[in-house]
């Protein structure tokens, strides 16, 4: 390993996960300080070391093209709103049809069923953290968020140009009220929402899990299991079956699309790819004076 005798600085997307690629945060304050120091450090590497470093620390999809000083990201657009696509046309990487084909071919996979958002009484992290209603702060350039439900509904309002409802959503701290406000978005078009909703939830969960170490490690600990929102009520984001139902264990009998579970699996894949070598970094370099 060419880099073994060097203090390895983490790439920007690992050093300050709360700052997006094109955020002004890289041009002021601690973000600017880090990006300059990182650039100076990168210049000390030989061509061989730089190639090795790049292989060890691939860009996340949200920084696609950064190593080549290009913008290779693709977006879905509607008016002034846009969201990054992870897969062509923003389609899910995993689907119920894919899983049913896996099961039909005899490739059964472990299922990890979750539902509900309340923390455990002993303070231990449970599968509730996978819920859209789980309270955990995360940030984007646009705003801070207290849960994924708030992020999704604020994006929904922004998608349809309803600034008033978006502002109300961002000021609200009750998940139930946030969901109700999301239903009041003016100019709503179901076809447009269906095109954008998965990409919105995918990106929001990337922010949520990439910025929170404990959640990130718990998600990665689920391995390659199929994540399943066992909501007995939701046929879009869940399977419309309770975890206690025998049918919940059989994807052939699911009554819902499980879009949330599949989005979380896609986030898990990307986290694993991007963070697999972060233990090699010298984290003391992030806040070095």
Where are the regions a protein language model picked out?
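Charged, low-complexity intrinsically disordered segments
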Residues: 2-289
């Amino acid at each position: 390993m060419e880099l073994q005798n060097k203090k390895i600085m983490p790439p920007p997307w690992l050093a300050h996960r709360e700052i997006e690629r094109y955020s002004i945060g890289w041009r002021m304050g601690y973000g600017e300080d880090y990006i300059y120091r990182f650039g100076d450090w990168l210049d000390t590497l030989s061509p061989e070391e730089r190639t090795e470093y790049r292989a060890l620390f691939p860009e996340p999809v949200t920084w696609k093209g950064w190593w080549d000083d290009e913008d290779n990201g693709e977006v879905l657009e509607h008016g002034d709103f846009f969201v990054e696509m992870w897969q062509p046309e923003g389609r899910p990487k995993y689907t119920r049809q894919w899983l049913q084909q896996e099961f039909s071919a005899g490739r059964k996979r472990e299922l990890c069923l979750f539902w509900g958002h309340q923390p455990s009484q002993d303070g231990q992290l449970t599968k509730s953290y996978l819920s859209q209603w789980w309270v955990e702060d995360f940030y984007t350039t646009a705003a801070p968020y207290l849960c994924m439900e708030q992020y999704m509904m604020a994006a929904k309002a922004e998608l349809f140009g309803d600034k008033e409802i978006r502002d109300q959503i961002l000021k609200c701290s009750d998940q139930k009220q946030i969901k109700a406000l999301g239903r009041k978005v003016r100019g709503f078009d179901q076809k447009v929402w269906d095109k954008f909703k998965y990409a919105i939830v995918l990106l929001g969960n990337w922010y949520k899990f990439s910025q929170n170490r404990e959640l990130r490690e718990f998600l990665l600990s689920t391995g390659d299991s199929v994540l399943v929102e066992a909501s007995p009520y939701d046929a879009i984001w869940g399977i419309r079956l309770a975890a206690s139902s025998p049918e919940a264990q059989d994807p052939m009998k699911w009554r819902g699309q499980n879009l949330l579970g599949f989005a979380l699996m896609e986030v898990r894949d990307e986290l694993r790819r991007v963070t697999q070598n972060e233990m090699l970094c010298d984290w003391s370099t992030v806040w070095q004076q």
